[in-house]
Amino acid sequence: MAGQSPPVLGVGLIGSGSAQAAQVISNDQLSQRVDTNDEWIRTRTGIGRRRVSTADQTLVDLAAEAGRSALTMAGRSPQDLDLILLATSTPDDLFGSAPRVQAELGATNAVAFDLTAACSGFLFALVTAAQYLRTGAMRRALVIGADQLSRFVDWDDRRSCVLFGDGAGAVVLEASDEDGLLGFLLHSDGARGAVLNLPANDTSAPLIAGAEHRAGGYRPIVMNGQEVYKFAVREVPAVLQSLLKRCDVSADQLDWLLLHQANQRILDAVADRLSVPGAKVLSNLAAYGNTSAATIPLMLDEAVRDGRVSSGDLLASSGFGAGLSWGAALLRWQGPT
């Protein structure tokens, strides 16, 4: 009938994939560079090692590998894709790396672009991609979270260099009668953004007589760890509780809590405030550290492949980080197990 709104479609989460950086750096190895030790790092962060890309391993390499793996699990070809969304803060090309991922995959029918929201990036990208599918404008999307924060870490600052690693994770979304994105909430607060950022260089250079310009490039990551912790343990439980209430779901109905892998203390505090038992909290911090936009899909893929997450499982997920940005999504996994 003329003027009738199109049906709102469900969004199925049907495949996952991940990719790891080539080099493994243990806490003991890192202590050879900075004044730290394994016990100090583990007790404060839960991290035992992290992966760091080699000089010839690009972000596109990691993102394409994760995407290819997700497509294989989903049983879809690159040509089936209508959309590729790459959540990253560390593109190989500042103008965008998603088109290069599209080319590497051979996804000739897909439009591809980057989305930057730091450690919340994957969750924001997942929600964004889902809207294209819900309207019927697109049928299938590949959402990738990938970062190489090792390029922007001050490796002589023991407070921050122990935290970060490189990696990528991906999920295939498909329009479906059964909805796998049951609800979401997203937030930003730029007024508090100074507690965690990766600022551009502020040095100037002469251009012509009477004029100057600011040189390109970025300074290392700047972080107030105490303030970031307070932000996370306050906002993440609150947004998850609000989402569960909106979706009429109780915490004890959840199969898994899938959080951004920033710090084990944060994961434990959020779970405690939600009364979610530790056995339901997914964590791979010990092996990978904080891989920024990659943490959620990388953790999901690992849990799917080792059999912890099964088709039909209900997951509450939250991403949080620089911006400040944070959000939550209630997901039902529909891929193979």
UniProtKB/Swiss-Prot annotation:
Its EC number is 2.3.1.180. Homodimer. Belongs to the thiolase-like superfamily. FabH family. Transmembrane segments: none annotated. The keyword Iron does not apply. It catalyses: malonyl-[ACP] + acetyl-CoA + H(+) = 3-oxobutanoyl-[ACP] + CO2 + CoA. Catalyzes the condensation reaction of fatty acid synthesis by the addition to an acyl acceptor of two carbons from malonyl-ACP. Catalyzes the first condensation reaction which initiates fatty acid synthesis and may therefore play a role in governing the total rate of fatty acid production. Possesses both acetoacetyl-ACP synthase and acetyl transacylase activities. Its substrate specificity determines the biosynthesis of branched-chain and/or straight-chain of fatty acids. One of its GO terms (cellular component) is cytoplasm. It is found in: Cytoplasm. This is Beta-ketoacyl-[acyl-carrier-protein] synthase III. Pathway: Lipid metabolism; fatty acid biosynthesis. Pfam families: ACP_syn_III, ACP_syn_III_C. Keywords: Acyltransferase, Cytoplasm, Fatty acid biosynthesis, Fatty acid metabolism, Lipid biosynthesis, Lipid metabolism, Multifunctional enzyme, Transferase. Residues 261-265 are annotated as: ACP-binding.
